[in-house]
Amino acid sequence: MPSDFFLQPLDGGPRVPVGPGQTVIGRGPLLGITDKRVSRRHAILEVVDSQLRIKPIHRNPCFYQSSEKSQHSPMETQVWSQLHPGDSFSLLLDKYAFRVFSAESEVEMECTLRNSQMLDEDDILSEMQKSPVVNLPDKTTGASQLQGSPEITKTKCPTIDPMSSSGECRAFSEHQPRPTQRKRILPAWMLAESLSDQSLSTPAEGGDKDVIQRSGKAGTCEDRTPGNTSWHGKKRLSPSGNSKSVSAEQDPGKKCRKADQEGPGVSSENVPESSSSNIVKDPDVDIVKTNKQKDGILIEELGEVSKHKAATKPTTNEEGESCARVQSKSPPEKSQGCHPESSSAPSSPDALHTDTADPVLGCSEESKVRRTACMYGANCYRRNPLHFQHFSHPGDSDYGEVHGTDEGVIGDRPECPYGASCYRKNPQHKMEYRHSALPARVALDEDDDDVGQPSDDEDEEDYEPTDEDSDWHPGKDDEEQEDVDELLKEAKSSLHLKH
């Protein structure tokens, strides 16, 4: 039989149905209360004639609150009190409050909710029917404005100057697609550089001599064709009106470093005077600069290879001859590194330092300190480059020369106590100790009876016998010998008696 009443906890939780008849409520699983202040038999609920009533049976009172009042009032014990739908009661003053619901009240509440929802929907529909009449002009005007805005953007944005940056133009330009081609605007420092290039290119009208002198000061290469070098500088003068441009056609491996360092000087001659006010021709300057950077990288790599070859060439005679050979086989700039006073415009200090240091390294290879031999030899498993710099291994030119003989080792070392007869095979031991042959001992005379006595070259005063220090007594040895003989005789006699 379905229950007519339900208890809804105000603190949250599932509803508790109240069956017909009496129901004891309190601490337990029915209401989910575990507080010790609530008794297991705290009150009794009873359903009589479709009405619910409560009777407190514990000394701690229960509290009642009607749907019309906002305060809890204590109920008398052992007295029945009616509970109507919507009323609430609590087992304690501040906790465990429950509200009473009935099935009929639930149906009535659902009906009222449906009615209220229907009324709300009717109100909304009536408002919606009235609102289009009032709001249609606004919507139509808004739509017309939205439709007209693309036309405004199309008509207004192209007419606005691109240099003027205003907030309205930016807002309209966001809707407009970006053009495929855009005019390039160079920064101020590039414009200043182009003007300086033009000012440098104007004195080129004086003649070919001025151009050649200026290119020499700027660091361009002159025509040099030595027998053993592969450096070729080609110059070509192209007369064009009032000005003459000098263009150096050089391969990536045949371009001098000075021309790369003095980039503005060369670019000033390549830029004609007609490009004084045009900004469109400025990308050519960028192309020239990128080509120069690529050529400079290749030149530096080739320069390092040539320096390495020049530094590693063997020197057969004196240091002066080897330096002269390095100068003759190196490019012209390398010879300028050996003799800086001969060059009119030296290059950067770093390049000059490296050029002057490489021949010195090549000349000083003869006086290189030999490395010590590794104690592990061919069985060495180390791969550290520093280890190979300090120690030599089998296959190296200086391996085996350090510890092969004791005479070739430089430095003072202690003498091995075993000398030449040392049986140790550790090369580290041979490097740390000398193994020279011990001097032959002086042969003693066969007729010499003074064995164990001090030699003649020592002082006789140190070995003079004295009565005080001597422990020798003449009579003691004879007495000891007699005692030994007596003991032997006694032993023999005892043996004969036993047999």
UniProtKB/Swiss-Prot annotation:
**Which CDD domains does this entry report, sorted A to Z?**
FHA_APLF
* Comp. bias intervals (Polar residues): 141-152, 239-248
Task: Find motif (NAP1L motif) and give its ranges.
Answer: 463-487
Where are zinc fingers of the kind PBZ-type found along the chain?
Answer: 372-393, 414-435
Q: Name one GO cellular component term.
A: nucleoplasm
Q: What Gene3D superfamilies does this protein's entry cite? A: 2.60.200.20
Which InterPro entries has this protein been placed in? APLF (IPR039253), APLF_PBZ (IPR019406), FHA_2 (IPR041388), SMAD_FHA_dom_sf (IPR008984)
Q: What positions does the domain FHA-like occupy? A: 1-108
Molecular function terms from GO: 3'-5' exonuclease activity; ADP-D-ribose modification-dependent protein binding; DNA endonuclease activity; DNA-(apurinic or apyrimidinic site) endonuclease activity; histone binding; histone chaperone activity; nucleotide binding; poly-ADP-D-ribose binding
Which keywords does this Swiss-Prot/TrEMBL entry list?
Answer: ADP-ribosylation, Chromosome, Coiled coil, Cytoplasm, DNA damage, DNA repair, Hydrolase, Metal-binding, Nucleotide-binding, Nucleus, Phosphoprotein, Repeat, Zinc, Zinc-finger
UniProt key word Coiled coil: yes
- Renumbered residue ranges of the record's region Disordered: 134-183, 197-292, 305-358, 440-499
- What residues bind a glycoprotein, as annotated? R371, Y376, Y381, R382, Y418, Y423, R424
Q: Spell out the Basic and acidic residues composition-biased ranges.
A: 251-261, 281-292
Posttranslational modification: Poly-ADP-ribosylated. In addition to binding non covalently poly-ADP-ribose via its PBZ-type zinc fingers, the protein is also covalently poly-ADP-ribosylated by PARP1.
Which residue ranges does the record annotate as region Flexible linker? 401-411
Annotated positions of the Phosphoserine modification: S116, S149
User: In which residues does the motif KBM occur?
Assistant: 182-191
Briefly, what is this protein's role? Histone chaperone involved in single-strand and double-strand DNA break repair. Recruited to sites of DNA damage through interaction with branched poly-ADP-ribose chains, a polymeric post-translational modification synthesized transiently at sites of chromosomal damage to accelerate DNA strand break repair reactions. Following recruitment to DNA damage sites, acts as a histone chaperone that mediates histone eviction during DNA repair and promotes recruitment of histone variant MACROH2A1.
The entry assigns this protein to a family as follows: Belongs to the APLF family.
Note on domains (UniProt): The PBZ-type zinc fingers (also named CYR) mediate non-covalent poly-ADP-ribose-binding. Specifically recognizes branched poly-ADP-ribose chains generated by PARP2. Poly-ADP-ribose-binding is dependent on the presence of zinc and promotes its recruitment to DNA damage sites.
From the Swiss-Prot or TrEMBL record, give the protein name: Aprataxin and PNK-like factor
* Natural source organism: Mus musculus (Mouse)
Q: What is the lineage of its organism?
A: Eukaryota, Metazoa, Chordata, Craniata, Vertebrata
Gene giving rise to this polypeptide: Aplf
